[in-house]
Amino acid sequence: MKWVIIKGVRYPSSVISAFAAYNMDNPFLKVRIRNKYHIVSFDDVNKMASQMVYLMNNYPDFVEIGRWWISKKTVMSWVPKGKAVDGSGWVISFTRSFGLEGGTQIRFDKEDEYLSEIDRLNELFNVIL
């Protein structure tokens, strides 16, 4: 069994299904462990960044959606929605086997970023066009 270490605590790698970094005055990670969200605080942004790099290296099958890194297995579907109804940008909507803070959509200010993300997701999920 493979284990990972999050700020000194060891967890079986199979119990972690998502994680995200929050860079504020008090940096922290939000980690989904055994279907519950845990907040792991850090003294400074550099320590948190090191932990994020460690997690990203140990979960190569996770994909970045918005600020979250989640297991590809939990993504049930995703749909490019195009221009947002309010005209605020371009939207990609996701259906996952669990909810994440921040909703189920990611927005892009520029159309080229939106199209680039669609291409990236098509490649990540081996979409047959």
For each of these PLM feature ranges, what is it?
Residues 9, 15-69, 74-129:
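Acidic, Ser/Thr- and proline-rich intrinsically disordered linker/docking segments
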